[in-house]
Amino acid sequence: MKKALLIGINDYPEGNELTGCIEDINSVKAAIERHGDGSPNFGVKMMPNVQTSGEVMDAIRKLFAGNDDTALFYFSGHGYMNSTGAEIVMPQDIATPGQYYTGIQMSTIMSIVNTSKVRNKIIILDCCHS
C-alpha cells in the first residue's frame, strides 16, 4: 500500500500568511492519487491549515506506522533554521509571541521516519530552509 500525508498551511497569525500552500497540496494530490490509466496509486490524507504541532506529529506517526510499501510526507508552509542550525517546519500554533521559531524539528520527524518499517520513505518540504 502507498500512503501520502499532504500538509499545506496558508493561514498563519500576525501577518505571516502565505498563499499557494493549499493549492500546492491540491496539485500534489492530483498528481499522485491515481495512475495515468485512472487506477488507484496513493491513498492521500490532506491536512489544509492544520492547527497544532500535536496534530501534525500524530499524523506523521500514523503515516510511518506499520509496514506499508511507500509513505510520502509533503509539507508546504513556513520553515526556519534556528541558531543551532536545526531545521524546523512550522504549523500554525508556533506563531504565538515568544515561541515563533519552536515548531517541529526535522530531527524529531526523522527519528520517526528512520525507525519506521515502511519500505520506501519520501519527504518533500516546500518551505524556506528545506
Whereabouts are the PLM-identified features?
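Boundary/activation segment at the start of structured domains
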Residues: 1-88
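Caspase-like (clan CD) cysteine peptidase catalytic core
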Residues: 53-130
